[in-house]
Amino acid sequence: DRDSCVDKSRCAKYGYYQECQDCCKKAGHNGGTCMFFKCKCA
C-alpha cells in the first residue's frame, strides 16, 4: 500500500528516486517523488 513505500524505498540525497517510483507503481499509484528523504506516492 501507499505507506509501505515510505519504509521500503530510501530516497537518495540528490533526487534519485527510481526505487520510490517503482515501489509506488507496483502499489498501483502513478508514481512517486521524494520529500525530505521519504518516498511519497502520487
From Swiss-Prot:
Q: Give the superkingdom in one word.
A: Eukaryota
Ordered alphabetically, the record's keywords are: Disulfide bond, Ion channel impairing toxin, Knottin, Neurotoxin, Potassium channel impairing toxin, Secreted, Toxin, Voltage-gated potassium channel impairing toxin
Query: Does the entry annotate any disulfide bonds, and if so which pairs?
Result: 5-23, 11-34, 20-39, 24-41
**Reported tissue expression:** Expressed by the venom gland.
| Chief localization | secreted
Q: Which GO terms describe its cellular component?
A: extracellular region
User: What GO molecular functions are on record for this protein?
Assistant: potassium channel inhibitor activity; toxin activity
Looking up InterPro entries in the UniProt record yields:
Ergtoxin, Scorpion_toxin-like_sf
- Please give the Pfam families that the UniProt record associates with this protein: Toxin_17
Give compartment(s): Secreted
Task: Describe its function.
Answer: Blocks Kv11/ERG potassium channels.
Give the comment on domains: The presence of a 'disulfide through disulfide knot' structurally defines this protein as a knottin. Has the CSalpha/beta fold, which comprises one or two short alpha helices connected to anti-parallel beta-sheets stabilized by three or four disulfide bonds.
**Family to which the UniProt record says this protein belongs:** Belongs to the ergtoxin family. Gamma-KTx 1 subfamily.
- The entry's protein name is Potassium channel toxin gamma-KTx 1.4
Q: Supply the source organism's classification.
A: Eukaryota, Metazoa, Ecdysozoa, Arthropoda, Chelicerata
